[in-house]
Design a protein with these regions (language model features):
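Short, contiguous, pocket-lining structural segments
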Residues: 115-120, 137, 155, 165-168, ...
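Short glycine/threonine-rich loop-to-helix capping motif typified by GTGT followed
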Residues: 113-119, 244-249
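Short arginine-rich
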Residues: 152
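C-terminal nucleotide
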Residues: 1-16, 41-75, 172-279
Length: 279
């Protein structure tokens, strides 16, 4: 996150990539994301009154009133990412926000898998924290942004996107344990190679996609495993041989989901070691 001096405050909030560890964050395993050099720019300006005006250079703006209950807008309205964060801040820091306007501009492709939604959520949280001296920690803001996605958008996401956007640093990968939230910054020294992002122009929306269904499948798998081995709290920590032993208790799709999660967790930890060893 970077704060500059335009408006009362201008924030640049980056997108993110994830090298490996897909669908692992909500299964309590390890992921290996990094912030990227594309971002959302948000300009904030304080004002009198209680009505806030949010504008965007790419879509219609909207208004909300801080003195009225904050409720989700209609399905898929982009404003839910913003007002969900506002709701979370008001619950943690009641009566500390006053009216503001903000203008949003982005060079992050929307729905392209580089977390434009998390960039918006975390940028709003960071900016308001700075603007109103809310004394929210990094982790406070990360969790506010994640909860906004759960409660206002309808995506039961893990914590990786918001964590990577908030904690990412230039030329660093983040090895994140999504259960404990312990993390390690790993130098992304891959010369003479570069990571290149390709925009396929295929858009997706996690809230209306199979994302939530995949999470439900993983939860079904864990519930079956816990009926035999209650010591396991997360799917990513279950040994592969246990999943294979219980194969007949899973339907075909759930078995594939569970197997993938455990194998992907192993691949992620192996990949992080290879990168750290410069191999």
């Amino acid at each position: 996150m970077v704060a500059t001096n335009k408006f009362d405050l201008t924030v640049q909030s980056p997108g993110r990539i994830n090298l490996i560890g897909e669908h692992i964050d909500y299964n309590g395993g390890h992921v290996l994301p990094a912030a990227i050099n594309l971002n959302i720019t948000i300009g904030f300006k304080k004002k009198t009154g209680s009505v806030c005006h949010i504008t965007s250079k790419s879509t219609d703006g909207f208004l909300f009133n801080l003195e009225e209950p904050i409720k989700p807008k209609s399905n898929n309205h982009w404003g839910n990412y913003v007002i969900g964060v506002i709701d979370g801040i008001l619950k943690l820091r009641p009566n500390l926000l006053s009216a503001f306007d903000c203008e949003i501009e982005s060079n992050l492709p929307i729905g392209s898998g580089i977390s434009s939604s998390a960039a918006l959520e975390c940028g709003i949280a960071f900016g308001l924290n700075e603007l109103f001296n809310l004394d929210l920690t990094d982790l406070d803001r990360i969790k506010i942004a994640q909860k906004a996605e759960h409660d206002f958008v309808g995506t039961k996401c893990g914590i990786m996107d918001q964590f990577a956007v908030t904690m990412g640093q230039k030329k660093k990968l983040i090895l994140l344990n999504c259960e404990t939230l312990d993390y390690q910054l790993i130098p992304a020294d891959i010369n003479p190679y570069k990571i290149v992002l390709l925009n396929t122009n295929v858009a997706h929306n996690l809230a209306s996609s199979e994302y939530n269904l995949r999470r439900e499948d993983c939860e079904k798998a864990l519930k079956i495993i816990q009926s035999h081995f209650p010591e396991y709290k997360h799917l990513a920590e279950v040994p592969l041989d246990i999943i294979k032993t219980l194969e007949k208790e899973f339907d075909e799709v759930v078995f594939k989901r569970a197997t993938y999660v455990v194998e992907e967790e192993n691949r992620t930890q192996m990949a992080s070691k290879v990168i750290q060893n410069g191999e």
